[in-house]
């Protein structure tokens, strides 16, 4: 191959790798934040309607999640862990915690789930971002970095639209559906 053909072929491979990195991180953030943190928002009216929670307890659940996110964000600075492992575990735990919200109606279980879920979403956000940005820098593909951060918005829009379409099925089905 000529130097130009080699350069073009290498560029194509790097572009494909960069796209995969950015989209993978975007999906991770959509799940961790869009579902793990913010699915509660479109589900809260259904929880209020079916009487499983009142507005005061809904506020407490949101506060537990915020506290967990704060704890998770602060502890990221001291955790010395494999980023990929944290992201994979964070996504799996997000699935489990989301399903748990739909299979119980015990407030203190919900509170614990929201607290832990907040920390997990922070860890997943920070470590997926760090890994993705470092990998994009290695590929000299900085232009893809913004795609990563569309993930939370994609997740929030997705959960909102899905609940608008399937809200008649109830909050429990919504939680379980988002978890699966």
Please identify what each model-predicted range represents.
Residues 65-70, 153-154:
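Short hydrophobic/small-residue motifs within alpha-helical transmembrane segments
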Residues 52, 103-109:
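Helix-breaking motifs and short loop linkers at transmembrane-helix boundaries and internal kinks
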Residues 109, 139, 146-180:
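Helix-loop-helix hairpin linking two adjacent transmembrane segments in secondary transporters
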Residues 72-84, 167:
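Helix-to-loop junctions at the C-terminal end of transmembrane segments
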Residues 17-45:
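Pair of pore-lining "gating" transmembrane helices in MFS-fold secondary transporters
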Residues 42-56:
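Short amphipathic helix-loop junctions that connect adjacent transmembrane helices
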Residues 85-100:
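Structural signature of the two symmetry-related core transmembrane helices
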Residues 113-151:
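Cytoplasmic helix-loop-helix junction between adjacent transmembrane helices
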